[in-house]
């Protein structure tokens, strides 16, 4: 039997500050496998529509606020995220606000009539505020940001773009 070292080792070459140089070299050479060993988590506060864009990234782990079990009636109000594409003081914005107010009123009515949060949530719009924690490795975060902040496969959803660009700025 013969045993050999299968990979190149360079622990003896590691110095203070060499990690950043090494990561940049790995990225430049498109050797992304090494980036899969580092991960971090981000908490997004966004609307349910944007959360559907986020959870499409399958190489990640998620924890999202549940509309099935959260009883918004107990907290006193339902929170909505204002769309970035509606201008203030326009008929569109006024209609959006009215629609959210009607949804909240209907939700609270259904709860007061004994419906469960799971049943009452059916009247809540995509603009409903939610919280999502996403954990991914560095390679997946690069992919996420290339799609959601940089539009590498087409124009991103306007509110997803706002969330992703904000994250990208924070990471730089």
PLM segments and residue spans:
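Family-specific signature for flavin-dependent thymidylate synthase
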Residues: 1-172
């Amino acid at each position: 039997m013969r045993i050999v070292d299968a990979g190149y080792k360079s622990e003896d070459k590691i110095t203070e500050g060499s990690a950043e140089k090494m990561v940049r070299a790995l990225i430049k050479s498109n050797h992304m496998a090494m980036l899969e060993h580092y991960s971090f988590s981000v908490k997004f506060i966004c609307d349910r529509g944007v959360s559907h864009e986020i959870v499409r990234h399958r190489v990640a782990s998620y924890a999202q606020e549940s509309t099935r079990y959260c009883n918004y009636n107990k907290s006193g109000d339902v929170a909505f995220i204002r769309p970035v594409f509606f201008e203030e003081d326009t008929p569109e914005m006024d209609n959006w606000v009215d629609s959210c107010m009607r949804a909240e009123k209907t939700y609270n009515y259904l709860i007061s009539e004994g419906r469960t949060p799971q049943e009452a949530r059916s009247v809540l719009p995509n603009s409903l505020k939610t919280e999502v924690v996403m954990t991914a490795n560095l390679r997946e975060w690069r992919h996420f940001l290339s799609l959601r902040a940089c539009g590498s496969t087409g124009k991103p959803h306007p509110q997803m773009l706002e969330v992703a660009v904000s994250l990208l700025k924070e990471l730089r």
